[in-house]
Amino acid sequence: KIIQNLQLYNLALSDTEGSTELNLPIRSKSLFKDNIEELFKLGSATIHTANIFENFKSITVQKKKLDNLNLRENIGFIKIDVEGHEQNVIDGGLQTIKKNMPVMLIEIEERHSKKPIIQTINNIKELGYDAYFLDKDDLVNINQNNNFKLERNFVFIKKN
């Protein structure tokens, strides 16, 4: 353990259990700020089958549901950054999420999930959350009147 209340698990989270292929994009050894394609590949490993790269290698990893990890009580925060597999992770952790109602920071992008961002946002809101994005130093509540579609990182906080 690195920190007293932090546990690391060497596995992928989803809505099913077993083994799966983790796709790792292969990139060139050099990385320049104007090489957008190479920058995109950084941190883009995924088990989401709709998000496949032209040049990648796969490794087999264990896949579990968040609900089956037997985590401690009082989970206060969950970070999800899974390149298109967000809804699957949430579906596999519904009991944990509903029981603890943690603050969640979730990266959601249409280019990864291949579905509208608002669909995932609305699914999470139905669990009893308000949805926000960060604009400079302010949390802005997502509604039909603001331009949240340019955002990627969303904060979900239990409704009052």
Q: What residue ranges belong to the model's regions?
A:
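Phosphate/nucleotide-binding beta-alpha loop and adjacent structural elements of enzyme active sites
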Residues: 1-160
